[in-house]
UniProtKB/Swiss-Prot annotation:
Species, as recorded: Geobacillus stearothermophilus
Role description: Catalyzes the hydrolysis of aliphatic N-carbamoyl-L-alpha-amino acids to free L-alpha-amino acids. Is strictly L-specific since it is inactive toward N-carbamoyl-D-alpha-amino acids. Is not able to use aromatic N-carbamoyl-L-alpha-amino acids like N-carbamoyl-L-tryptophan and N-carbamoyl-L-phenylalanine as substrates, but is also able to hydrolyze N-acetyl-L-methionine.
Family label: Belongs to the peptidase M20 family.
Cofactor(s) it depends on: Mn(2+); Ni(2+); Co(2+); Fe(2+)
Protein name, as recorded: N-carbamoyl-L-amino acid amidohydrolase
Cofactor note: Requires divalent metal cations for activity. Binds 2 divalent metal cations per subunit.
Residues reported to bind a divalent metal cation 1: 79, 90, 189
Site (Necessary for dimerization): 234
One family name in Pfam for this protein: M20_dimer
UniProt-annotated binding residues for an N-carbamoyl-L-alpha-amino acid: 192, 225, 273, 286, 355
Keywords: Cobalt, Hydrolase, Iron, Manganese, Metal-binding, Nickel
Top-rank lineage group of the source organism: Bacteria
Lineage, uppermost ranks: Bacteria, Bacillati, Bacillota, Bacilli, Bacillales
Annotated EC: 3.5.1.87
Length: 409
């Protein structure tokens, strides 16, 4: 039933908004590029027969009424913002597939008991203000007031950017949904990994979203001459950092489920011929079970302290962020499982290592996700790609999942 070609054409058209010379997409929140993207998607929503509006957080919403307009709403969507020089599938696939689902329903005269709303959430990525999931936090009523003071690289605060975009930060609480008004939230998203590709499958059903902790390590010692300081006398923070990073890899591997990453490292003063006086790096540690993740962190912390003592360097750690894992709803997973079977695809279960808006919505409603195969597992890159055929399959599974949820009492 889904028109895969229409979905693909819209994905490609939206991918031109914010396109960079590299071929990547930069579409940050509350910018002209995001406004153009919202306007384009709003036109798709109207074409699909939806009532279109934006809430106080700037979330773009298209509503299809149900036979009972007072029934709880089924939400389906994702986000339109991107990272710097990202891809054109991360986020937009979920929004545009949601539009395709309700447009297909309307074109075939399909009515549902529950209303359906397609949502394009504001600033999921957090690339501009280094604080993400603003729209979904606002909808859940959990956006902290201090988030409005987060600033971008040019010193513009989130509150100022909202005002520039025509929004009133003081009205943000109005975006919160009342308890008991949302039946479920379903999101179609690219996997951003290689699990489905290795399994040879176009789609998978997400079991849960991993919880993360970010920990900043600072290791300090004396800055000394690289040539004049014998190896036996060195107190080298860089060598200690390298050893600790190997420990992170070792401890994460032990569980079979935990992932540990150091993707950011700064060395001071940064001279070729200077033993560093300070090294800073940030650990990203994730697991679907908080207790497993926390056990891994404790093991890393103990071994890191031992390394620091043995090397006679100073070690401090600071927890920057923590996010609890969220398990997907059995009701949503079962609906997605039935959809896969109906379409002839074996149900394949996998966790999401990346965070998504559903994490924020979980306190107010059951959530679920469907993944589409990513080519080579690449994401947050101009090389991000999922095939037209896989996107269409994902949209079909989404259609049958949403239909089940919207028909039930």
């Amino acid at each position: 039933m889904i028109q895969g070609e229409r979905l693909w054409q819209r994905l490609m058209e939206l991918g031109e908004v914010g396109k960079q010379p590299s071929g990547g997409v930069t579409r940050l929140s509350f910018t002209a590029e995001e406004r153009r993207a919202k306007d384009l998607v709003a036109s798709y929503m109207r074409e699909a027969g939806l009532f279109v509006y934006e809430d106080a957080a700037g979330n773009l919403i298209g509503r299809k009424e149900g036979t009972n307009p007072d029934a709880t709403v089924v939400l389906v969507g994702s986000h339109l913002d991107s990272v710097y020089n990202g891809g054109c599938f991360d986020g937009p696939l979920g929004v545009l597939a949601g539009v395709e689902v309700v447009q297909t329903m309307n074109e075939h005269g399909v009515v549902t008991h529950h209303p359906i709303e397609v949502v394009a959430f504001t600033d999921e990525e957090g690339a501009r203000f280094r604080f993400g999931m603003i729209g979904s936090r606002a909808m859940a009523g959990t956006l902290p007031p201090e988030a409005l003071e987060c600033r971008d690289a040019e010193g513009i605060s989130l509150a100022e950017a909202m005002k520039q975009a025509g929004l009133d930060p003081d009205r943000l609480p109005q975006a919160a949904r009342k308890p008991g008004t949302v039946k479920a939230y379903v999101e179609l998203h690219i996997e951003q990994g290689r699990v489905l590709e290795e399994a040879g499958l176009p789609v998978g059903i997400v079991t849960g979203i991993a919880g993360l902790i970010w920990v900043k390590f600072t290791i300090a010692g004396p800055a000394e001459h690289a040539g004049a300081t014998p190896m036996s006398l060195r107190r080298d923070p860089m060598a200690a950092a390298a050893q600790i990073i190997i420990v992170i890899e070792e401890e994460a591997r032990r569980t079979g489920t935990t992932v540990g990453t150091v993707g950011q490292l700064h060395v001071y003063p940064g001279g070729i011929n200077v033993i560093p006086e300070r090294v800073e790096f940030v650990l990203d540690l994730r697991d679907l079970k908080a207790e497993v993740r926390d056990q891994v962190w404790k093991a890393i912390a103990v071994r890191a302290e031992t390394i620091a003592k043995e090397r006679n360097v100073r070690l401090t750690t600071e927890r920057l962020q923590e996010m609890a894992p969220v398990l997907c709803s059995e009701v949503v997973k079962q609906a997605a499982e039935r959809a896969c079977k109906q379409l002839g695809y074996p149900p394949f279960w996998l966790p999401s290592g990346a965070a998504h808006d559903g994490v924020q919505l979980a306190p107010i409603c059951p959530i679920g996700m469907i993944f589409v195969r990513s080519q080579d597992g690449v994401s947050h890159s101009p090389a991000e790609w999922s095939t037209k055929e896989d996107c269409a399959v994902g949209a079909e599974v989404l259609y049958h999942t949403v239909w089940q949820l919207a028909q039930g009492e």
